[in-house]
Amino acid sequence: VAEEDLLPEPEEYSRNMELAFWSTEKHEQKRNGYPVVFRYQKASEIFREFQSMAAKRGHGASSFEMQANGQVVLFINGAGGAGSGTATAGCAAAMAAQGKNTVCFTLKQNACNDSFDICGSSMTDVMYEISMWRQLGGKDQGQLQMKLQSMLKQDNETEVYSFAPFDLPVSAMNFDAESVENLIQAIKGICERCVISADGTLSPMLLKLIRLADWTVIVSDSTAEGNEKSSKLLDSLEAIDSMDEKLIVGKMGVIFNRFGSTGQKLALPKYASELGTIPRYQNADKK
C-alpha cells in the first residue's frame, strides 16, 4: 500500500504483487486503475481489504481458515408477502447498530434488491464461486472465506455487509443443501452475525439452513390466511423433527408482522415461542 506521489511508476510493482494506494476519501474505489485503501479506519477493516485483494489475485497468497464463531439468524416467510425480507433487514441493521460485524443476504428465488442502498456481488456469483471452489477440491476453507469476503459490500447507512439477491430465479434452483452448508460455514468465519431470509417452501436446502441456524424465525402477516399457512409450516417442521434429529427444538420463534386492529395471532405449538408483533403503520414517515 503506497502513497501515490512516492510511487511514480506503479506498473513496475504491480506485476509481482497486489498494489493499492492510500486514500483519505472513504468512498473512493479506484485510482488510475488500482484499488485504494481508506487510511482512517480500524486496523481490522484494513486487514479485511488486504484479504480481499489477495482473494481477487487468487494466487501468491497464503490463506488461512478463520474460526467459524459467527451466529446465524434465519427468517422464513410463513406466508407469501408476510414481510420477512423487511424483518431480516431490520434485524441485521439493529445488530450492526450494536457494533456487531453483520452480514445479510436472501436465498429467496425471486427477491429484489430493496433492503440496502449498497450491496455486494449477487448470490448467483456467490453460487458460482462456491461451485468453482468445490471443483478444486473444496478443502481450503480459508480461500473460500477470503473470496466471499471480497464480494461483500457495506451499506453506508446501516453498516450492514450484504450480497445482492440471485440474478434470476433459475439460478437459485441449483443452490442445493451442500452449497448452503459451504456458504454458511465460510460466512460464520468472517462475521459475528449472519442474518438470512429464505422462502418457506420445504426442501432439503431449507432443512439444512434450519439445522445450521442458531435461531429460526417464522414471519406471519397476522391475517387468518397467513396464520393458517404459518401453522401448517410449523406442523410440518414438527413432523420432520419427530422423525429426524432435533431439527427445531429450542430455537424456533414467530413474529406477527403488519399487526393492526384486525391482526390475529395463531396458537403456537409448545416448541415455538412468540417473539412479538410489528405494527402496521399507515404513515410512510413512521415506517
Model region roles, listed by residue range:
Residues N182-R193, A198-P279:
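Conserved catalytic-core segment of NTP-binding enzymes
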Residues P8-R15, E25-Y34, K208-I210, Q264-Y271:
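Short loop/helix-cap segments at secondary-structure boundaries that form the rim of catalytic
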Residues A2-E3, E12-V72:
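Extreme N-terminal, non-catalytic leader segments
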Residues V1-L6, W22-E25, Y40, I76-A79, ...:
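Structural motif
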Residues V1, R15-S23, Y34-P35, Q71-V73, ...:
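Hydrophobic beta-strand segments of well-ordered beta-sheets in folded domains
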Residues P8, H27-K30, Q41-I46, L168-V170, ...:
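A short acidic, often aromatic-flanked loop/helix-cap motif at beta-alpha or helix-coil junctions
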Residues N69-N110, S115, A186-I187:
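Walker A/P-loop phosphate-binding motif and the immediately C-terminal alpha-helix
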Residues L107-G189, D285-K286:
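P-loop/Walker-type NTP enzyme "switch/lid" segment
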